[in-house]
Amino acid sequence: MKIAIDAMGGDHAPKAVVLGAMKAIKEYSDLHITLVGKEEEIRQYLTSDERITILHTDEKIESTEEPVRAVRRKKQASMVLAAQQVKDGEADACISAGSTGALMAAGLFVVGRMEGIERPALSPTMPTVDGKGFVMLDVGANVDAKPIHLYQYAVMGSVYAEKVRGIENPRVGLLNVGTEDEKGNELSKQVFAMLKDAPINFVGNVESRDLLQGVADVVVCDGFTGNVALKSLEGTALALFSMLKEQLMSSFTSKLAAAVLKPKLMVLKDKMDYSEYGGAALFGLKAPVIKAHGSSNDQSIFSAIRQTREMVAKEVIPTISSVMEKESLQ
């Protein structure tokens, strides 16, 4: 199995990418990794090149650049070359912690869209209080969705949750303003009617306040709604941890309490740590394309590689294609 990784993408590249790749190589004997980027910088952190190949390029896409224009103009950028490796059959999948918009553009223009899928979806795995997490799609790839798009998202998310996350008969919920069947705007009502007859375990409408309680294994929404929900959850979590830290450090007594509570607080922090869940899969493409978090450390990169390996090994893309074909959506 071969995975191409944009070694120059992310806040801590190339160090975090290289260290994460080496950790994955030690963990999985069937894995071969191509690191795409500046060879001189990559080799500063590469202590072993066992099953690791470097594809040198001096060019990269900056987060400040317009995504589509950058992908079209910078054919030799590390992210674009990683996607090209997939298109040329040199890699089974690719990963980048770089610009989300640029990776979506590279996925569409280079890797290519799966036949029958109208719009790809960006799908991270979000934490829950029980530590199991849930898959959420779409969170920004397609802000102007049609009912058929969300139907396809539900099917793709269900296949992923079962194949990669190991959840038998995953529960699929539709993000809405209430749990009653008739709730929502016209888009939500049409999607609800379609999902009732879909070949999935549809559990109905779910509200954003219940997401972290694990009300569903897969949560479906349009990209605009999903992005707002995602940012709200992230912001709330950061604010709560910040307030908690402020209170625990406010006096000598509270500092003593913090010392006693530290093991429990670390467990809580680990439960909410995105680095354990891998990256956000871009569903609807011909091959797995994974967006790692921009601030990924080496553990985050390792988790993204593990996730990508599972997608390839469990044949997620062929399975999605097969299910879609049976549903006469292709």
UniProtKB/Swiss-Prot annotation:
* Keywords from the named record: Cytoplasm, Lipid biosynthesis, Lipid metabolism, Phospholipid biosynthesis, Phospholipid metabolism, Transferase
Provide the primary localization: cytoplasm
Q: Does the keyword Cell membrane apply?
A: no
Q: Does the keyword Protease apply?
A: no
EC id: 2.3.1.274
A GO biological process this protein is involved in?
phospholipid biosynthetic process
- One annotated Gene Ontology cellular component of this protein: cytoplasm
Where does this protein reside within or beyond the cell? Cytoplasm
- Please report a single Pfam family linked to this protein: FA_synthesis
Pathway this chain belongs to: Lipid metabolism; phospholipid metabolism
Substrates-to-products reaction catalysed: a fatty acyl-[ACP] + phosphate = an acyl phosphate + holo-[ACP]
Task: Give start-end of the signal peptide.
Answer: none
| InterPro entries the UniProt entry points to | FA_synthesis, Phospholipid_synth_PlsX-like
Entry's Gene Ontology molecular function annotations: phosphate:acyl-[acyl carrier protein] acyltransferase activity
Give the main EC class: transferase
Enumerate the HAMAP family for this protein.
PlsX
Summarize subunit and interaction data from the UniProt record for this chain.
Homodimer. Probably interacts with PlsY.
The record's similarity note reads: Belongs to the PlsX family.
What's this chain's function?
Answer: Catalyzes the reversible formation of acyl-phosphate (acyl-PO(4)) from acyl-[acyl-carrier-protein] (acyl-ACP). This enzyme utilizes acyl-ACP as fatty acyl donor, but not acyl-CoA.
Query: What is the name of the protein in this document?
Result: Phosphate acyltransferase
Give the species.
Answer: Bacillus cereus (strain B4264)
